[in-house]
Amino acid sequence: MVGAVIDLFCGVGGLTHGLILEGFGVLAGIDNDPSCKYAYEQNNRTRFIEKSISEVDGRELNALYPNNQHKILVGCAPCQDFSQYTKKSRTGTKWQLLTEFSRLIREIEPDIISMENVPEVRTFNRGEVFNNFIQSLEQLGYHVSHSVVHCPDYGIPQQRDRLVLFAAKQGVIKIIPPTHTPENYRTVRDVIGSLATNYSGGHWEGDSMHAASRLEDINLRRIQHSVPGGTWADWPEELIAECHKKESGESYGSVYGRMEWDKVAPTITTQCNGYGNGRFGHPEQDRAISLREAALLQTFPRSYQFAPEGQLKFKTVSRQIGNAVPVALGRVIAKSIKRFLEGLHERQRVRIII
């Protein structure tokens, strides 16, 4: 085991799963959403603690860490208040979760910390929230680094940019170099091209997650007139919604769109099961992408289960998938920490020899 990890705001376990695949031992995941418990525990074989972070005490988490392992604390605070998709409110309360994260860091004093979030967290409230968080870490003696990751550069097949922060007391952790270039980005075809044909409202018997939302008649007609990468402007006049005919509607070109086979997907959101919620139409089949396809584009393994058989709820699972840290990004974070620890151990070994 490389190190012992506790995952705050763990959701269904995207970050946890990436860490486990890279050899880390995850002691527990903490989240206040009880619907995530099944997927988290079923796929990761570790403990799910249903609590709000404000209810968590550092002493109870410290008791979980073994004495002979590096203590690692990771988390992805809910990002809706920071995201460009929710600019309406600039006075939200979810940023206070960073304050709670900072409190737990003070109480636990982990060896290594990692946080993943949207890039907008750096400028939210004129940068005050993020800068205060960094200052609190530095005051505790941590070396802090952060960078914006363009997910396709690391084999994640969607247009997703994420802020990744590291902090360690024994040096600076740097993110590993990119593994892909635009010439060999993983595409929609690479990831979902082999799945069975499906249809609007269809379920595939071999996988309950390969299920697509049922389209209303008008939306079925719309997707039949949609081309990959196109917009609602490609439709006949009678299919265009009145709101899109207004000047203000021109800025919503990606809604009711199809993905393109040989490009990366758009950002997978919490409403990725709906054709009208973004460019979530299948590249050639007349339907929205299925839940399994959305999960694969978030780099979850095909075997990842999100609900017990017969208890699948579209909106719940779609939200879980959209909120998740892509598993492959979890592996990038894990590899970056592992490389740092290997370098640290090598330096310590050299000192002993000398």
Curated annotation (Swiss-Prot):
<keyword id="KW-0680">Restriction system</keyword>
<dbReference type="Pfam" id="PF00145">
    <property type="entry name" value="DNA_methylase"/>
</dbReference>
<keyword id="KW-0808">Transferase</keyword>
<dbReference type="GO" id="GO:0003886">
    <property type="term" value="F:DNA (cytosine-5-)-methyltransferase activity"/>
</dbReference>
<feature type="domain" description="SAM-dependent MTase C5-type">
    <location>
        <begin position="3"/>
        <end position="344"/>
    </location>
</feature>
<dbReference type="InterPro" id="IPR018117">
    <property type="entry name" value="C5_DNA_meth_AS"/>
</dbReference>
<dbReference type="GO" id="GO:0032259">
    <property type="term" value="P:methylation"/>
</dbReference>
<keyword id="KW-0949">S-adenosyl-L-methionine</keyword>
<comment type="function">
    <text>A methylase that recognizes the double-stranded sequence 5'-GTCGAC-3', methylates C-? on both strands and protects the DNA from cleavage by the HgiDII endonuclease.</text>
</comment>
<keyword id="KW-0489">Methyltransferase</keyword>
<dbReference type="InterPro" id="IPR050390">
    <property type="entry name" value="C5-Methyltransferase"/>
</dbReference>
<dbReference type="GO" id="GO:0009307">
    <property type="term" value="P:DNA restriction-modification system"/>
</dbReference>
<dbReference type="InterPro" id="IPR001525">
    <property type="entry name" value="C5_MeTfrase"/>
</dbReference>
<keyword id="KW-0238">DNA-binding</keyword>
<dbReference type="InterPro" id="IPR031303">
    <property type="entry name" value="C5_meth_CS"/>
</dbReference>
<feature type="active site">
    <location>
        <position position="79"/>
    </location>
</feature>
<dbReference type="InterPro" id="IPR029063">
    <property type="entry name" value="SAM-dependent_MTases_sf"/>
</dbReference>
<dbReference type="GO" id="GO:0003677">
    <property type="term" value="F:DNA binding"/>
</dbReference>
<comment type="similarity">
    <text>Belongs to the class I-like SAM-binding methyltransferase superfamily. C5-methyltransferase family.</text>
</comment>
<protein>
    <recommendedName>
        <fullName>Type II methylase M.HgiDII</fullName>
        <ecNumber>2.1.1.37</ecNumber>
    </recommendedName>
</protein>
